[in-house]
């Protein structure tokens, strides 16, 4: 039997810790965390469920320690089958993969990214009442016959798994320059159209840098590149220059709020400093159907940190998910995947990521607006 049934609230009491001390000890969060969780608070007069039960999801990167550990040496849930069983019992119904590899000793072997492996994985998903929604794989960096063939194979695997989406956890490019973003847009249009032929939506992900400002104007540097900005954010330019029928976005809401905190000013062509505060929900609301997936990642405000936030279980941070989900429109049609990069507790707390999965699911279910 796998020992994954520790109630985190009982553990807090047993250890004589308050919730702030508990999360500081287990995740390095040094800021206060409330017992009820900011995200789980309903707005006055609002009582509608914001994330319907069939759309409460998780990306397996959050529990990567559990997927990757050796079942022969650990008493905890290990490998895809056992971890998916645990997540299903918690209540999750959607799964986003972060690759298709697990520990070699887990049932099914190390690599399930084959036709046989995906068929086995699909059987487990179906048995557990889980729906695969997407995968953080890779979108080829060039358009070649070999890369096209590899992408088609990835789409075939996605279809075996029953996914509606296929994507990546990386930004389309790390460049600050228009030419590179337009090249990325052309490449994504190509592969997005190809994904559409397979019945899939191709999506990209964001980190905070993707919502910083393009360098697209002003004096040129020694290499002939612009040094100032017109105020357009990188991923906004990408969105405007890709085909909405073939290219979609998964907003990582935590990183979008980090961008709101960090990327607030730009140097205009005339050399003046201009303030422009990013509005993540407003951006989504303008084209809400282009954002079929979210990373529902929470964070505690901490201005001593460069990012302005420290990651926390969903509902235990300061990102106002009730307001965000109300503002973006198309209520109940998005697919929020809970993610917490810092959930794995290492050898000191091997059951932590799955415990945080329980806490986060409860807060997702309680969210009203």
List each language-model region with its residue ranges:
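N-terminal twin-arginine translocation
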Residues: 16-21, 32-48
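Structural motif corresponding to the early beta-alpha repeats
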Residues: 90-191, 196-201
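Short, acidic/polar
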Residues: 70-86, 144-156, 276-283, 321
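Boundary/entry segment of secreted carbohydrate-active catalytic domains
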Residues: 48-80
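Acidic/histidine-rich catalytic cores of soluble enzymes
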Residues: 195-313
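N-terminal secretory signal peptides
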Residues: 1-17
């Amino acid at each position: 039997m796998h020992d994954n049934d520790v109630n985190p609230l009982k553990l807090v009491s047993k250890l004589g810790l308050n919730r702030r001390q508990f999360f500081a000890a287990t995740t390095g969060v040094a800021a206060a965390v409330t017992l009820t969780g900011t995200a789980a608070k309903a707005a006055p007069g609002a009582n509608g469920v914001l994330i319907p039960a069939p759309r409460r999801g998780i990306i397996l990167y959050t529990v990567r320690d559990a997927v990757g550990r050796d079942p022969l040496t650990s008493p905890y849930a290990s490998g895809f089958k056992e971890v998916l069983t645990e997540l299903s019992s918690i209540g999750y119904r959607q799964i986003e993969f972060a690759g298709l590899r697990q520990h070699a000793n887990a049932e099914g072997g190390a690599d399930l990214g084959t036709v046989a492996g995906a068929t086995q994985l699909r059987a487990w998903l179906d048995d557990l009442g889980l729906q695969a929604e997407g995968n953080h794989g890779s979108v080829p960096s060039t358009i070649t016959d070999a890369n096209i063939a590899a992408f088609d194979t990835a789409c075939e695997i996605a279809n075996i798994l029953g996914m509606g989406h296929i994507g990546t956890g990386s930004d389309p490019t790390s460049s600050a320059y228009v030419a590179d973003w337009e090249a990325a847009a052309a490449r994504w249009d190509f592969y997005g159209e190809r994904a559409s032929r397979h019945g899939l939506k191709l999506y990209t992900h964001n980190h905070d840098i993707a919502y910083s400002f393009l360098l697209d104007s002003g004096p040129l540097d020694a290499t002939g590149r612009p040094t100032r900005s017109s105020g357009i954010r990188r991923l906004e330019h990408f969105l405007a220059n890709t085909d909405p029928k073939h290219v979609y976005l998964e907003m990582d809401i935590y990183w979008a709020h980090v961008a709101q905190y960090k990327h607030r000013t730009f140097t205009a062509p005339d050399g003046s400093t201009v303030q422009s505060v990013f509005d993540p929900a407003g951006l989504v609301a303008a084209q809400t159907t282009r954002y079929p997936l979210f990373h529902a990642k929470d964070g505690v405000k901490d201005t001593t940190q460069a990012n302005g936030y420290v990651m926390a279980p969903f509902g235990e941070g300061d990102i106002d998910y009730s307001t965000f989900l109300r503002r973006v429109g198309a209520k109940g049609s998005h697919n929020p995947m809970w993610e917490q990069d810092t959930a794995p507790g290492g050898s000191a707390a091997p059951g932590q990521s799955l415990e945080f999965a329980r806490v986060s699911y409860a807060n997702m279910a309680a969210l009203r607006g």
